Amino acid sequence: MKNIFLHSLTLENYRNFKNLELKTDNTPIILIGENGSGKTNILEAISLFYPGRGLRSAKLADICKASEDQCLVKALLQSKLGLAEFTTQFKRSSNRRITEYNESKIANNELSKFTSMVWLTPQMEGIFTSGSSDRRKFLDRIVYNFDSKHAELVSKYEYYMYERNKILAEDIRDDNWLKIIEEKMADMSSHIANNRLKTLEFMQQAIDELENEFPKADLSIDGIVEQKILDGKENIVNFITAELYQTRSKDKLLGRTSFGVHKSDFLVKHQKKNILAKFCSTGEQKAILIAIILAEMNYAIKLTKIAPILLLDEVFVHLDDKRRGYLIEFFTGLNMQLWVTATDLEGIENFANKAQLIKLPIIL
């Protein structure tokens, strides 16, 4: 098994940190500090070495330290391709982000070729009651760990969708170019939908096989394209192309693309109660979310032979002793780099004995 882990992390003008340098190894790491000390900021900085905008989905302008125009995150990381240096820089004035791998520029969506990462934060606990976009992005992040090309597919699909919307809005009479764009979107849609379905099959198997202290869930996706594939629809690309063509007038009026894989919803049911997670209690929703993360970790390692970096923000809070103990045993048994935030060590004393402790002062 190959482990993805950080050897070092450097922050410059990042959030509340002027300068911070951490040296780490392939072990559990506990960030200890009061609220406001920057624990979650460190996890967010690490998450930027994975496709997307990090675990907060923050705007670039919010990431740089107040009064500073630019900031930097640098990591020496044991990647899928070996030891490498990664940097990501932000410039507030130009609203630009530049990411580099061994001093060569790479696209953000290429990061899944090098890294693998899973995170769980308090903000995610509302994912079952929020909009479908949040759940869909959550599912796609899971897919990244099974298929490193998925992030690039999603990014390109969104780009061509933007181009299509622009052509329709500006009334550019170029049917040829519009046809090419829609054909590209259809081809990518087919791959995206198939990747999601394949990953859900893996995940469901992992959930059903893994016996733990958390409720089992039934996973599915509510989307026209995905359902057509499940129904055995032939020539799915032609079907999508035809739908995009037929909705041109409607989409011109709406100012957006009304059909496609960007409209799909990730559905989660409490298996025993047979009700959607959004109708469960907040405690049950958190437990179901943890169960999904456990399944993702377990099956990603089993299938890809790669252990991702795991980021857990205040996850042990409000868990009973039994569930807390199970999580600690599960995660330490995986022999991977795990980052945990906590205000104190109460309830995780035994875990702390096996971890690297990093104490953070409050930075005023």
From Swiss-Prot:
Any one GO molecular-function label of the UniProt entry: ATP binding
Keyword tags: ATP-binding, Cytoplasm, DNA damage, DNA repair, DNA replication, DNA-binding, Nucleotide-binding, SOS response
GO cellular component annotations of the record: cytoplasm
Plastid found in the keyword field: no
Classification via Pfam families: SMC_N
Family: Belongs to the RecF family.
Role according to the record: The RecF protein is involved in DNA metabolism; it is required for DNA replication and normal SOS inducibility. RecF binds preferentially to single-stranded, linear DNA. It also seems to bind ATP.
Protein's name in the database: DNA replication and repair protein RecF
Source organism (scientific name): Rickettsia felis (strain ATCC VR-1525 / URRWXCal2)
Lineage: Bacteria, Pseudomonadati, Pseudomonadota, Alphaproteobacteria, Rickettsiales
Gene name, Swiss-Prot/TrEMBL: recF
